[in-house]
Amino acid sequence: MRSKKMTHGLEKAPHRSLLHALGLTREELARPLVGVVNAANEVVPGHIHLDDIAEAVKAGVRAAGGTPLEFPAIAVCDGLAMNHEGMRFSLPSRELIADSIEIMATAHPFDALVFIPNCDKSVPGMLMAMLRLDVPSVMVSGGPMLAGATLAGRADLITVFEGVGRVQRGDMTEAELDELVEGACPGCGSCAGMFTANSMNCLAETIGLALPGNGTTPAVTAARIRLAKHAGMKVMEMLERNIRPRDIVTEKAVANAVAVDMALGCSTNTVLHLPAVFAEAGLDLTLDIFDKVSRKTPNLCKLSPAGHHHIQDLHAAGGIPAVMAELDRIGLIDRSAMTVTGRTVGENLDALGAKVRDADVIRPVDAPYSPQGGIAILKGSLAPGGAVVKQSAVAPEMMVREAVARVFDSEEAACEAIMGGRIKAGDAIVIRYEGPKGGPGMREMLTPTSAIAGMGLGADVALITDGRFSGGTRGAAIGHVSPEAAEGGPIGLVQEGDRIRIDIPARALDLLVDEDELARRRAAFVPVEKEITSPLLRRYARMVSSAATGARQR
């Protein structure tokens, strides 16, 4: 066993002494040592209950004959970090999470690991660490938050973000917004829609690194505690059978993950996270693969922000197994892919009797919400390296549009213009120098997109950025424009009043300026350089790759 590096042999007597100082007995040290990575904290609503999940995991490990040893991981709440300097640190935290777990699990060689994340960067960060370490592992997340219940109906965090714009527009009073604020997020869990956290938790289940039910079982249920106990027991089986993460994460898992991503209408952040995760297993997931799969995968779900359903509805409708079973009907699921159950995807679906229980929440493949997947990859003169849009959340009027560029070099400047009423129908807001390198940190633009929606401009205004978007964003929000402005990309050459053509069905994003004029602008171009006071962000800006390759650190 791997843990023998610190428990066995004459020369490891000092190590055993330190382990006994933890209160561990000889009998406990003779059993497999299982690291339990717990991202609990009292800051993030999706993580405040993770100690309960960890206790259940440890009970499962002990029941199966192991000795659990818990250690912490950080987690950022993107909602709390939104629209201020803190958002620059959210995406960098993904690599920091992966690196710190690698440090802990190598310095203290556990035989197996159970990972307990929940929110946006903690899930991909832990998946990256899992594949990097490649010891028998299982992930069990904290689960989704329930939707809020208000006098106006169901609500979630995005309802509140958009409420700010509605107040500004005069459609809602501040008193009504205050009521919404207190009711939209009723308790623990990852925010209730198909936002980034739930997208990644659902895809961890799809990939096979988490047990069935991981993506959709609500945080507040006893079923989530039972799932955590099963995860603790299952990791012991993985250890006994020597099934490792890289045995599970193969090209088959990549194909399944992208297909389910498109069927669910997941967050555009999956286009950053999945390539970074799969790269740890030596697999290359490109933008072209995303687009190829999107073109042939029907969009079966319209969960918030694209529609009125929430993750609890997806769970009641059959969850991820039901979505996979539906896609399996048209050959889009590789049933032979291995999972942490110790069985293949096909064996899991058969054992679960996976089927759709609500055809409004999970549409049949022959009557989908749309014939193509939730995410589209655009290319053109404005984004030669690619750009990303959640087409399932775009108003029909904005699928093909020629718009007038309104150019801003920061999110704050754009928000001021939107809230000040200076953005009109037919405008395309261009926010640049918000990419991985230029931000640095590639902030999410949820505040401006929510303001656009709240002010009733969602079917009339586009937002184009080298930054990224929250999974809660809806509308013609085109992000990850590559190359970014800080690297000399064409988005840095756009001027106020330029015309931009958006053609999502044709996968095109073009700046309608002739080549001679662009050449003149390029010759005079000097990228904006920001003063970066944070050592971490300075390192990040030097090391981060393009958004087109997952914003990975080199």
Swiss-Prot record:
A family per Pfam: ILV_EDD_C
N6-carboxylysine modifications at: 121
Residues that, per the record, bind Mg(2+): 78, 120-121, 444
Catalytic activity of the protein: (2R)-2,3-dihydroxy-3-methylbutanoate = 3-methyl-2-oxobutanoate + H2O; (2R,3R)-2,3-dihydroxy-3-methylpentanoate = (S)-3-methyl-2-oxopentanoate + H2O
The protein's name: Dihydroxy-acid dehydratase
Record-linked NCBIfam families: ilvD (TIGR00110), PRK00911.1 (NF002068)
UniProt cofactor note: Binds 1 [2Fe-2S] cluster per subunit. This cluster acts as a Lewis acid cofactor.
Family under the similarity heading: Belongs to the IlvD/Edd family.
PROSITE patterns: ILVD_EDD_1, ILVD_EDD_2
GO biological process: isoleucine biosynthetic process; L-valine biosynthetic process
HAMAP family given in the database record: IlvD
A GO CC annotation given for this chain: cytosol
Encoding gene, per UniProt annotation: ilvD
Protein residues bound to [2Fe-2S] cluster: 119, 191
The protein's annotated pathway: Amino-acid biosynthesis; L-isoleucine biosynthesis; L-isoleucine from 2-oxobutanoate: step 3/4; Amino-acid biosynthesis; L-valine biosynthesis; L-valine from pyruvate: step 3/4
Alphabetized UniProt keyword annotations: 2Fe-2S, Amino-acid biosynthesis, Branched-chain amino acid biosynthesis, Iron, Iron-sulfur, Lyase, Magnesium, Metal-binding
